[in-house]
Amino acid sequence: MKETYVIGIDYGTDSVRALLADAATSETIADSVFSYPRWGRQEYCSPAEARFRQHPQDYLDGLRHVIGEVVAARPDAAPHIRAVSVDTTASTPCLVDRTCTPLALRPEYADDPDAMFVLWKDHTAQRESEEITALCARGEINYARRSGNHYSSECFWSKVLHLLRGSERLRRDAWAVVELCDWIPAVLTGCRAMEDLRSGLCAAGSKVMWAEEWGGYPPEEFFAGLDPVLLPILRRLPVRTYGCDTPAGTLSPEWAAKLGLSEQVVIGVGNVDCHSGAVGAGICHGTVVLNLGTSACYMAVMPPEKMGDRMVEGIFGQVDGSILPGMVGFEAGMSAFGDVYAWFKRLLCWPLREVLLPADPENETLRALAAQ
C-alpha cells in the first residue's frame, strides 16, 4: 500500500496546532503548536468590555509555522501528504473586502479591532443578541429555535450587527463577512471571491441561522426588521453549505510553494472545533462527548426520526449534520471553563506576586510559583 499522510489543523483560543498523521494507521507522525503573539500580549482586547479580537496575521503566521514544522519533522512524508483539513473556534467572524481579504490586512485597518476576527468569546454584542432573540420570539417562525430559543452574543449576526452599527467606515468598506473556519480553507485554496467560497454547514447551521427547514438563512424581511444594514451581508453569503467531509478545493500554487507541498493536496471544508472533537472521540447515538478547554462543549447526536419536530429548550446548537452526516448534532456546555480556572489561579497567586515575593525577591520557590 502506498504511503498516505494527512494534516489536521486546529485553531484554538490561544494557539493553532497541527498534526501529521498516517491515514492508514492513524499513527501520529509529527505535531506542532504556535501561540498567537499578538493575542499573547492581549493586543486589541479589553476584558473589561468583554472585547476579544484576534489579528488575521497571527492566523497566517501560525499556519505557515505549524505546517512547516510537521513537514520538516518528516520531509520524506511531504510528497505523500494528500489532504489538509481545518477546524477553528466559532463564531469567529471577520469583515472582508471583495477579495475575501480581512480588512485588518489592509494598512488603513491594521490596528482597528473591529476589522479583525471577533473571537468566539467576545461579548460586546449583548444588546444585539437581545434584539435578535426578541425579534425571533415575535415572528411566525422562530429562527432561534435551533439554538434553544436564544441567539447568543457569541454568534455571527449579533457580532456583525454590532460592528456595522459602530462604524460608517466599516459599513462602506466591508463587502462581506467570513467565519474563520471558512476563511482558512479559502486562503489555502486561493479563493478570492465570496461566490466561490465553500461555506461549512457546521458553522452556518450552529452560528449563522442556516437551516434547510426555512430554505437556508432567514429571509430578507427578517433582517430588514432587525436592521437593514445587514442586508448586503446577507445577500453575499453563499446560499449552499457543505459538510466537512467535502473538499473545498486543492492547494493553490502560492501556498503549495510556501509550504513545500503538492498542488494536488485536497483542502477540506472547514469545521467548528468542538464538533471535530466529538468526531475524533468516536461520538455516536447514546454517548456524550465533553470537549474541555477554554470553554466546555458537550456534544451529542441523535437520529432525526427520533427527534421529530421537537427542539430542546436551552441547547445552544441543534443542527442536522453538524457533527455526523444523517444525525442531528447537539452542542451545549459552558462558555467559561478553562478561563475560570485561569482566573482562580491568578487570584490564588496574587499574594505570592504582590506581597511575599517583593518581601523576599531572591526566594527561588516564590519566584517559580509567581511566574506560573
Segments from the language model and where they lie:
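ATP-dependent carbohydrate kinase catalytic cores
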Residues: C155, M209-P325, L352-R353, A359-E364, ...
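Gly/Ser/Thr-rich active-site cleft segment
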Residues: Y11-T13, A134-N271
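N-terminal glycine/serine-rich phosphate-binding loop of ATP-dependent small-molecule kinases
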Residues: M1-L105, P232, A257-V269
